[in-house]
A protein has these predicted regions:
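N-terminal hydrophobic/helix-forming segments and targeting peptides
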Residues: 1-276
Length: 276
């Protein structure tokens, strides 16, 4: 059981966004002997284990046993989880701080996100050869870049009485100290009123776009879009005097993803009859 816990925590630590969940899961299957199929190809399949990656967002894996007509068993799990998602054109300034405009995604428990160092992970879409051939890059800061802080208790005496948080005001993560607007003007990415969709001047891009460009190692003008989520950077752990419990972010729903993966990998190892 200890081995399974360690593998689960390693998996959760790597799956910091839905895109990373698909990528990590795909690599697990390939390392276990699965063959990747392309949706554009015509398939003539014998007994074996196969996986299909659909645009980096969805994964289908199946094992064809010795007697495919024997049984058919299906299991599924969603690769997303409660998180804080970064909105388009997210930079906002307030009282000397630069914050991110975000949305609360899924059934997150708001107060558990306070005072936690937050990293960012997801995918960034870049200009390709033409409008029909764009590139996408996985991004994971692997370090804290933001935080949603609590006020000190002497500034909020009712904090222990059960305070309802205003998501639009009190749940905006702090990204950095505000820079001089004259030295660092911020404008929305892909402003429709701008005659140039990709202006050459670096000052046309907000701090978030510049940050993503640094992470991807590209020019800000190459960024078309992104889907980024914030995540707690602390690692999961086994706890309790007998190691009976697990504490980790993203248990909902990565435990299900890991369980489904473990099942289909085991089906390949035992070469069970039917289709899994």
């Amino acid at each position: 059981m200890k081995f399974d816990n360690e593998q689960l925590l390693k998996y959760i630590g790597a799956c910091t966004s839905p895109y990373h969940t698909v990528d990590t899961s795909l690599q697990m299957l390939l390392d276990s002997g699965f063959t990747e199929l392309n949706l554009d190809d015509e398939w003539q399949l014998d007994s074996g284990s196969y996986v299909v990656n659909v645009f980096g967002t969805t994964l289908f894996a199946f094992h064809i046993g010795k007697k495919p007509e024997h049984t058919l068993r299906i299991a599924s799990a969603h690769t997303d989880f409660p998180a804080i998602r970064v909105k388009p054109n997210p930079i906002t300034s307030m009282k000397g701080y630069t914050k991110l405009n975000v949305e609360m995604y899924g059934g997150l428990i708001e107060n558990t996100w306070l005072d936690r160092p937050l990293g960012a992970a997801g995918t960034v879409v870049l200009k390709g050869k033409n409008a029909f051939d764009v590139d996408s890059v996985l991004v994971d800061t692997k370090r804290p870049i933001a935080i949603v802080p609590n006020l000190a208790i002497h500034m909020n005496r009712s904090v222990n009485d059960g305070v309802k948080l205003n998501r639009q005001k009190e749940m905006l993560p702090i990204l950095m100290m505000e820079r001089n607007n004259e030295d660092n003007p911020t404008k929305p990415l892909n402003n429709r009123n701008n005659p140039s969709l990709f202006p050459e001047s670096d000052t046309q891009y907000d701090e978030w776009t510049k940050f993503l460009a640094d992470e991807v190692d590209c020019d800000p003008s190459e960024i078309l879009s992104y889907e980024m989520t914030l995540y707690p950077t602390e690692q999961g752990c086994v706890l309790g005097t007998e190691g009976d419990f697990i504490s980790s972010p993203r248990l909902d729903n990565l435990t299900s993803c890991f369980g489904v993966l473990s099942g289909i990998i085991q089906a390949r190892k035992t070469n069970v009859n039917g289709v899994r």
